[in-house]
Amino acid sequence: MMPSTGILMAGRVVVEEAPDVLNPEALRQRLNTNDCGAVVSFVGLTRETEGAADVLRLEFDAWQDRLTPVLERLALEAIKRFGVLSVAMAHRTGSVGPQEPIVAIHVGSPHRKEAFQACEWLIDELKKQAPIWKKEVTTDGETWNCLLYTSPSPRD
């Protein structure tokens, strides 16, 4: 895994782009859990099928200069919005095979409710705002899914 390019707020935010491999547990170990009573995690995996077709792989491309700043901004917004204490998140780029992790999000919080809310919000916003594009390669052919990234935020 690539070293973190963003550690903010005295270690409260860890953001990574993972071009070769994503180890969700190693990322979770980097989450600052001081004063936390809950850690909520989400790990997205490549499905084995899409409709009737077998998935051979997903290929993710990212706007390299913008990915880390967008993820950092989302993590900071989650801390502010939900009152959680820390966020660690990473997204794969490159080729990802079936059942391999694509994205990992870990949220540390004094209480579980806020951690669950923040984690759900983070994956939803990541899919809307992160400059990442996905090509699905299946036994039926190849399809680009450009709906992962809709538009840059005016703050970016």
Q: Can you name each region flagged by the protein language model?
A:
Residues V55-T93:
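Compact, glycine-rich, soluble single-domain proteins
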Residues G44-A52, T93-G97:
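Short, charge-patterned binding micro-sites
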Residues P110, C119-W121, K135:
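Well-ordered alpha/beta subsegment
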Residues K135-N145:
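Short proline/glycine- and acidic-rich turn/helix-capping motifs at secondary-structure junctions
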Residues P3-S41, L45-R47:
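N-terminal small/polar-rich segments of proteins
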Residues F82-K113:
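Mid-chain, well-packed structural core segment of small domains
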Residues Y149-D156:
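Conserved small/polar residues in nucleotide/adenosyl-binding loops
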Residues I123-P131:
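A common structural junction motif
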